[in-house]
């Protein structure tokens, strides 16, 4: 596959349908080495998904890629009038000024109260990359955009709840493990998650 142009922009409500498809594909394919099928399906049903609060806050980003040749299997068409032929949705991720550490709209453990950038860490949230674009720098570019935006908002430290799969990326970018968490999803099924932090 030839090299691709990558651009990062803020997610919009019109992106939600494509983001959901991307997230489901990302979880089922990229996390298969770290979680059982039952864990992945339970996560999609109860925890993982689009967080519309991030979109409303203007803190959710999507990565679009455009290659020099057509790759219809790679990601979902962006659907934007200014996107042009060949742009596809390849990843998403955001940051938050709220207490929620992880989880989509349907997760019962959400806490939408605001945090104080003088004392609290910004939350790095909801990172997913389409399998066709894995290990091509998509996640790193989204993370960079999130850290810059959160820093501009006054935050100096960052915190996240990483999947076993995603923890590899964050470790490479300076995040360290703070604790291991077992998230009870449904009867008999839990998800191991790693809380990670990055400080100045």
Which residues does each PLM region occupy?
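Conserved GNAT-fold acetyl-CoA-binding loop/helix
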Residues: 24-50
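Conserved acyl-donor/pantetheine-binding loop and adjacent beta-alpha core of acyl/acetyltransferases
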Residues: 57, 79-134, 149, 182-192
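Intrinsic disorder/low-complexity segments
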Residues: 68-83
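C-terminal "cap" of GNAT-fold acetyltransferases
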Residues: 156, 163-167, 173, 179-200
